[in-house]
Amino acid sequence: MMKNLAITLIICIILGGCFASSDKRIVDNAGKSKVPAGAGDATTLPKAEFDKYYKVSESFYDLYLKPSGFNGAMLVAKNGQIVYEKYSGFKTFELKDSLDMNTPFHLASVSKTFTGMAVCKLWEDGKLSIDDEVSKFLAGFNYPGITVKTLLNHRSGLPNYVHVMEEKGWDKDHGVTNQDVLNFLIENKKKLSVGRPDRNFTYCNTNYALLALVIEKVSGMKYNDFLRTTFFEPLGMKNTFVYAPELEHSVLPSYNWKKQKEPFTYLDIVYGDKNIYSTTRDLLKWDIALTTGNIFKPETLAAAYSGYSFERKGVKNYGLSWRLYLYPDNKKIVYHNGWWHGNNTVFTRLVDDSATVIILGNKYNRRIYDAKKLYTAFGNYDGDGVGGED
């Protein structure tokens, strides 16, 4: 499959692009897209190199996203410079108001990268150790052996609140808060199936709901305020924020594949595992800040981008808030996908080749996760497309 795609994309480059499209792309008159203000130092690519990446990205969009009815935003960057930027569809299908570069999307599980790196910032600043037991920070949390690190790398053994609270009789007429998740774990410990800490990897939203509470306890600030003052404002991420219930009627809605609006549910209050809204350009600023080392020491990033789960053979792994592809030649893909209601998201960083792929959608569309088919344009990356997760 990958070889066939590579051949297709090469043909598209030679022909100057496979399809004409009336969809809006953001490119200046010189054929070079602009770098977001505040993004940091980005190199200017030679025109031939820029054109190559633009045509490959456009061909990917026309071959995979456009035929699937994609409704969202796509951005591809090389060395911090945007080589392709595309906004397709509507904020609301009822009003048919067009999406644009300032439209914040629900990031779903891509939000975990901010939660995890916020914890890493507290660690770097000496406010906590990732080897600290969670009970040190969360009163009543009597689960020995569960550390901050096992929450970060999904090796805690805890059950997923998204499923287990309903199974144990939670009244869905009452919205779940982060504190409710903690209280539920404390009060129902004897009724829950809990794995041995650090025994194996199990992706679990509970981990990041608890990490948000750890951030609040250690920093003395609300989660949204800590992220705003530590990341969003310093990096110029003006269209990025944490959802709150009072924003329900003003944030971008999501839709199922039939274009039917997805309702908010009792699970939509919890943050840390989800509930950050952002744009493709703001995520590029986040990527550049991580890449340039402006906010983290190299050793912190090395720990975040290291794998911690080796029970299964293969290149897939998970770091401290990042999904990873760790290749035998030491190349790695650092990324996170997301899925919540009708929101599908991809945030991929090809750190060895200084390339970034960001796709955000608010109408359910699994073809968004075919983004990995683009990666071979930037380097030697093998394997099938990366699937989505919640």
Task: Identify the role of each PLM range.
Residues 146-341:
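Short, surface-exposed loop or secondary-structure junction motifs
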Residues 79-81, 91-93, 156-157, 247, ...:
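Solvent-exposed coil/turn segments that connect beta secondary-structure elements
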Residues 44, 87, 98, 106, ...:
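Conserved beta-strand positions that form and line the central face of beta-propeller blades
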Residues 65-73, 95-151, 193-204, 271-272, ...:
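Short active-site loop at a secondary-structure junction
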Residues 78, 82, 134, 140, ...:
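Short, solvent-exposed turn/loop segments enriched in Gly/Ser/Thr/Pro and often Arg
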Residues 42-46, 92, 131-140, 164-170, ...:
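Short linear capping/connector segments at secondary-structure termini
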Residues 18-87, 216, 228, 233, ...:
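Catalytic loop of the DD-peptidase/beta-lactamase superfamily, centered on the K-T-G motif
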